[in-house]
Amino acid sequence: MKISLTDSSKQRRLVVEGKLLAPRAAELRNACQEARVDLRGRELVIEMKHVTTISQEGENVILELINSGIRFRCQGVFTKHVVKELTRRASRNLGDTSR
């Protein structure tokens, strides 16, 4: 897995490439925490680019980041599908206040 950082005046983007597998999936969480430190009003976006595999731990990290308000941009059918399903799950969990 490779994570790179790009900055513009409106966005800070973390570009994730490769396989999002345990135990390295936690690196994405750590990279997001570090990237949030100095946003200066910019939006933090995670771009999933050429991601070929996502483990359960990887899905858990993505779901956690979605729940914290981070936006994802995805390339590829597989990655789009996984992030879309996790976004739906996050929306359902937010709507379920009975627990």
Task: Locate predicted features.
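STAS-like cytosolic regulatory interaction modules
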Residues: 1-99
